[in-house]
Amino acid sequence: MLLLTLASHSSLQILHGAKREGFETGIVVNGKREGFYRRFSFIDNFYVYSSEDEAVEKINGTSNSVFVPHGSLIEYIGMERVSRIRTPIFGNRNLFPWESNQSKKMKLLELSNIKTPMKFENPEDVDRMVIVKLPGAKGGRGYFIGRNKQEVKEGIRRLQEKGLINNVEELIIQEYVIGIPMYFQFFYSPMLQRVEMTGIDIRYETNVDGLRRLPSDIKAEPTFVVAGNIPAVARESILPSVYEYAENFVKTTKNVVPPGAIGPFCLESIVTDTLDVVVFEFSGRIVAGTNLYVDGSPYSWLYWDEPMSVGRRIGREINLAIQKNRLNEVTT
């Protein structure tokens, strides 16, 4: 069987893991990036495209294959084109529209009894410091902090002038929770009927993470463009509540977006000084922070006692499904 993915985000990890699990591998790659990916011997097949429509054709042109989505898929290819993919997709493709809509994303978290930041529908209602986010997986680009409603309205006006948004309804305006970011990575296994923690990361963002190096008298507006990731482990006392969140999330998605979460997902959180975990967003697919753990994380070793990246864990789940003749339970 062929496992393939789009060249970006976590594609190297996905295909490296697939090869470790004995699969033939394939990458759908823009011709401008082909040379880079040719450097890696674990990629068996190259499906080179020059347009997004051609990328979908390349995916659909494969046989006996499973396509593995990642966090850049919708952003690069677009929801309408992704809906035309006929090749089986690992995970729940019905979650894609929910991930692309910030209001729906927050609704799933709230239905899961997960603690979330206060949300403001209208800039006029802002009465505290907030962070304003653009829709979709833009890697933090365009996000800004507003200390009051005047700053929020001014920031929105700048986004409109730059053509980044058409109307305010596209944005999510959230209370800015004071604490440290921790991104809790999970994997739900339909084959083993369990939620596994696969790692934790912190996003390394420019320029907010560089401002601390400046003298205090130099003022600069923070931006939140993700440039990399840093590994983390959490105090063990935090983990039970985070696991409860993850299990609640899986149960909710089964009811609201059947067949529910399958495979990797991430609860993107702030941990406060009282050790409360506040989840401000989720990712329903593999996140780039898993690239830190190509040989496994401190948590994946506790389950498998062998090197187990999330890419390899995806391959392992597909292998288990094939062995049990239940591939339809991990693909949609």
From Swiss-Prot:
Residues 93-323 form the ATP-grasp domain. Belongs to the phosphohexose mutase family. 5-amino-1-(5-phospho-beta-D-ribosyl)imidazole-4-carboxamide binds at H9, S72, N229. This is 5-formaminoimidazole-4-carboxamide-1-(beta)-D-ribofuranosyl 5'-monophosphate synthetase. Binds 1 Mg(2+) or Mn(2+) ion per subunit. Catalyzes the ATP- and formate-dependent formylation of 5-aminoimidazole-4-carboxamide-1-beta-d-ribofuranosyl 5'-monophosphate (AICAR) to 5-formaminoimidazole-4-carboxamide-1-beta-d-ribofuranosyl 5'-monophosphate (FAICAR) in the absence of folates. Mg(2+) binds at E268, E281.
